[in-house]
């Protein structure tokens, strides 16, 4: 009988990336893979784009808000309907396990899995749990965490950051597209790379547009998320989205200016890239990026600049500070033991699934 596993998670790329890393490993080992998500969400787009042999099952999903809104009443019914749909899907498929990467869409499948006696494994990327994972934790078999947690909860298992990004200098920059970029860059200048999430990138895009004088002192790479900004000109390369070019562009950068999303932060740690973190504040998020940034700065991996302090003089001062202490940051990153390869995490997850199914 073919072993089956269900993945869930979505809403943002960060809630899909790890799933896309793990799914090929399960397929290679003969598993039949299914995915529960929102058919209008990024998870559906990414699964289709991947070309992986995965059956996608769409469910209703509602946003879980931390504040009062009349929409909460409607979304309670959506979540409830999503649980009913998930119960039907999971009961029909009878999988050995469910793996969740979080996001609002993941809550109904995790609840349904628990009700049907299917082991549910969750991964939390941030220093503190989001609301979806706080709810899902109650129904989970195990929650894997990227960060060391101060709270001691029975079902938590710290595994570090799972990243497929390889170490520094492991790829050569040889593509024609990159060669074209290098023709516009000055080899005598430092290269800054700006990268933010879908919403977080807008502040960086505006900052670069408002301060063309940056190009006098630096080569600028701007991963903008906005195709209307695409440009290759004197000391400036703006591109909306990258896949194969992601790590080569990172290798080109002397310093990466980023938001505080944990996936990107740990990828930069794996590559030992100098980082200036400008996290989303509490007015635009639940404050998880501020916590992530604090974690990285206190361990000597990066420098932080708050968004409300993002002026050209402050930015230039912080950049100078990072370069002045470059050896300290690189030494701290080199001695870090917070990373785990996808293969080792897959082996751990497989062993935990086997153990949980034997107990059942």
Curated annotation (Swiss-Prot):
Tagged with keyword rRNA processing: no
Catalyzed chemical reaction(s): Mur2Ac(oyl-L-Ala-gamma-D-Glu-L-Lys-D-Ala-D-Ala)-di-trans,octa-cis-undecaprenyl diphosphate + UDP-N-acetyl-alpha-D-glucosamine = beta-D-GlcNAc-(1->4)-Mur2Ac(oyl-L-Ala-gamma-D-Glu-L-Lys-D-Ala-D-Ala)-di-trans,octa-cis-undecaprenyl diphosphate + UDP + H(+)
SUPFAM superfamilies named in the record: UDP-Glycosyltransferase/glycogen phosphorylase
GO terms under biological process: carbohydrate metabolic process; cell division; cell wall organization; lipid glycosylation; peptidoglycan biosynthetic process; regulation of cell shape
Membrane topology summary: Peripheral membrane protein
Any Pfam family: Glyco_transf_28
Pathway assignment: Cell wall biogenesis; peptidoglycan biosynthesis
InterPro entries per the UniProt record, alphabetical: GlcNAc_MurG (IPR006009), Glyco_trans_28_C (IPR007235), GlycoTrans_28_N (IPR004276)
GO CC, alphabetical: plasma membrane
Entry keyword set: Cell cycle, Cell division, Cell membrane, Cell shape, Cell wall biogenesis/degradation, Glycosyltransferase, Membrane, Peptidoglycan synthesis, Transferase
Membrane-traversing stretches: none
EC number: 2.4.1.227
Molecular function (Gene Ontology), one example: undecaprenyldiphospho-muramoylpentapeptide beta-N-acetylglucosaminyltransferase activity
EC class of the enzyme, as a word: transferase
Main location: membrane
Locations listed in the record: Cell membrane
Binding-site residues, UDP-N-acetyl-alpha-D-glucosamine: 12-14, 198, 289
Function of the molecule: Cell wall formation. Catalyzes the transfer of a GlcNAc subunit on undecaprenyl-pyrophosphoryl-MurNAc-pentapeptide (lipid intermediate I) to form undecaprenyl-pyrophosphoryl-MurNAc-(pentapeptide)GlcNAc (lipid intermediate II).
Family stated for the protein in its record: Belongs to the glycosyltransferase 28 family. MurG subfamily.
Protein name: UDP-N-acetylglucosamine--N-acetylmuramyl-(pentapeptide) pyrophosphoryl-undecaprenol N-acetylglucosamine transferase
Organism: Streptococcus equi subsp. equi (strain 4047)
Originating gene: murG
